[in-house]
A protein has these predicted regions:
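PRPP-associated nucleotide enzymes
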Residues: 1-174
């Protein structure tokens, strides 16, 4: 649900999973066939996992990090992992790059540049995200929702960002 001022988008688990299914349909209806899904950790892991199951394709993972300060709301320097975790040797062929959103576009641009430079076995690369913000300088190949007001997206699992094991002990009285 988008707030009246357009500054915040609150997403339930059901909405989140429905959006991932719609993303799968966009990729499927394009007719493009790919060999591997490469998700960006952490935001792309949940959509990447679900798409991997729907398309029955191997899932590779590349860690990136740029949100650091104020519970992840302020972007810092972008760190991109040097290696990709994949179940079958080196990532190659046609790759679907998955993240949760194109916010500034900086992460997706930098990752694609890195992949093109460092992973010659990748013959074709397309990107898929759930949300694209208006301020993004990168346009993904596949996106479900365009967000013209650039809201902060409150994903359903965000409560775990500040939860610690001691809080779980209190909650579950174990």
């Amino acid at each position: 649900m988008l707030t009246e001022d357009g500054k915040h988008l609150y997403v339930s688990y059901d909405e989140y999973h429905n959006l991932i299914e719609k993303l799968a349909l966009k990729v499927y209806q394009s007719g493009w066939e790919f060999d591997t899904i490469l998700c960006l950790a952490r935001g792309g892991m949940r959509p990447g996992d679900i798409l991997s199951r729907i398309f029955d394709k191997p899932l590779a993972i590349m860690s990136t990090s740029s949100y650091r300060a104020n519970a992840g709301t302020q972007q810092g320097n972008l760190d991109i992992a040097r290696y990709i975790t994949t179940p079958k040797g080196e990532i190659a062929g046609k790759v679907l790059l998955v993240d949760d959103l194109a916010d500034s576009g900086h992460t997706l641009k930098a990752v694609i540049e890195s992949l093109k430079t460092n992973y010659a076995p990748i013959t074709e690369l397309r990107s898929a995200v759930i949300w694209t913000k208006q301020l993004s300088t990168f346009t993904p190949d596949y996106s479900v929702e365009y967000l013209p007001t650039n809201p902060w997206i409150h994903q359903p699992f965000e409560s775990y960002d500040s939860m610690r094991p001691a809080q779980l002990l209190d909650k579950w009285k174990l």
